[in-house]
């Protein structure tokens, strides 16, 4: 299903100042669980920096087997992007967030879908969208007067630097302690701040001896991408309520934040599957989704 979404270069100020340019046509694949009757819940699936991979469809099947429809968003293909691992500037993270929220609107309008039971799960870059779509002011700016909101948010190994007032929908976070794309330490701090703001954090799961993309099975159990962009060394913060920025513990303006963001970025990161973490996270995901959706 094709739909219009935000210009790939726009940022959060454009969203909150109602300057979104719906210039990018993207698409997603809606799959319903076989033999479904009545209105079923749905999960919007946001892919990683590698785009849609076999693991994306594995997750789709995982939810379909639970009797949940899935909508796999393709933020890359229609925009002519293959991967953003070496260059994340090809698509802004806010644009991915808008991709997710407009997918919610699209899926909610489909027959046979329960609009009150639509969740979002995202991986790496997609996790940033799964998390940012929980902020009430972002949701309201994108969806306008509509009361639509995601029923739950599941960010898998995404960067955690944003805090703010959420819609109240529960969040379930997963991260590997050894992740060298993003900082697990920063995630711990950020999730703590989210709780202070009243966020409904169902669980924050950090796996020891676990790297990025731990749920993805590859030809090699572990490999190093020398040219991958990493922000593990960055101490970043964004307050989404007033759109203030923090770098290295200090409050800064947007230009200073962007300068620091480029400066603290390093090259080289690890992808490693971890069967134990994958199995445990899937069990926790299943229990969480079942509880929220009342399955």
Spans of model-derived segments:
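N-terminal cap/lid segment of alpha/beta-hydrolase-fold proteins
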Residues: 1-38
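Residue-level signal for short, function-critical loop segments
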Residues: 34, 48-49, 124, 159, ...
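Serine-hydrolase catalytic machinery in alpha/beta-hydrolase-like enzymes
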Residues: 15-26, 39-112, 226, 262-270
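Short alpha-helix in the alpha/beta-hydrolase fold that links the catalytic acid
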Residues: 58-59, 169, 183-193, 219
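Short beta-strand/loop motif that positions the catalytic acidic residue
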Residues: 173-175, 179
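Flexible "cap/lid" loop of the alpha/beta hydrolase fold
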Residues: 84-87, 159-172, 220
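Primarily recognizes the serine-hydrolase "nucleophile elbow" in alpha/beta-hydrolase
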Residues: 15-16, 92-168, 180-181, 185
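C-terminal catalytic histidine-bearing segment of alpha/beta-hydrolase fold enzymes
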Residues: 201-295
């Amino acid at each position: 299903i094709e739909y219009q979404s935000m210009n790939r270069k726009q940022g959060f100020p454009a969203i909150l100042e109602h300057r979104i340019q719906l210039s990018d046509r993207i698409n997603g694949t809606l799959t319903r669980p076989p033999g479904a009757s009545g209105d079923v819940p749905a999960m919007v699936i946001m892919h990683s920096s590698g785009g849609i991979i076999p693991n994306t469809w594995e997750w789709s099947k995982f939810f379909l087997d639970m009797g949940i429809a899935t909508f796999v968003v393709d933020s890359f293909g229609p925009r002519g992007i293959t991967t953003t691992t070496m260059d994340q500037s090809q698509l802004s993270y806010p644009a991915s967030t808008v991709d997710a929220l407009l997918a919610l609107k699209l899926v909610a309008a489909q027959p046979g879908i329960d609009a009150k039971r639509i969740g979002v799960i995202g991986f790496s870059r997609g996790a940033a969208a799964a998390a940012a779509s929980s902020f009430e002011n972002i949701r309201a700016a994108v969806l306008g007067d509509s009361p639509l909101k995601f029923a739950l948010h599941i960010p898998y190994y995404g960067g955690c630097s944003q805090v703010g007032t959420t819609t109240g929908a529960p969040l379930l976070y997963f991260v590997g302690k050894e992740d060298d794309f993003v900082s697990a330490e920063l995630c711990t701090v950020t999730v703590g701040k989210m709780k202070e703001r009243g966020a409904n954090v169902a669980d924050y799961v950090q796996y020891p001896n676990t790297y990025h993309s731990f749920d993805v099975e590859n030809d090699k159990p572990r490999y190093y991408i020398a040219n991958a962009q990493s922000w593990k060394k960055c101490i970043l913060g964004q307050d989404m309520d007033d759109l203030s920025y923090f770098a290295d513990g200090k409050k800064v303006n947007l230009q200073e934040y962007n300068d620091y963001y480029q400066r603290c970025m390093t090259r080289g990161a690890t992808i490693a599957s971890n069967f134990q973490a994958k199995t445990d996270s899937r069990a926790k995901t299943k229990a969480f989704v079942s509880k929220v959706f009342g399955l």
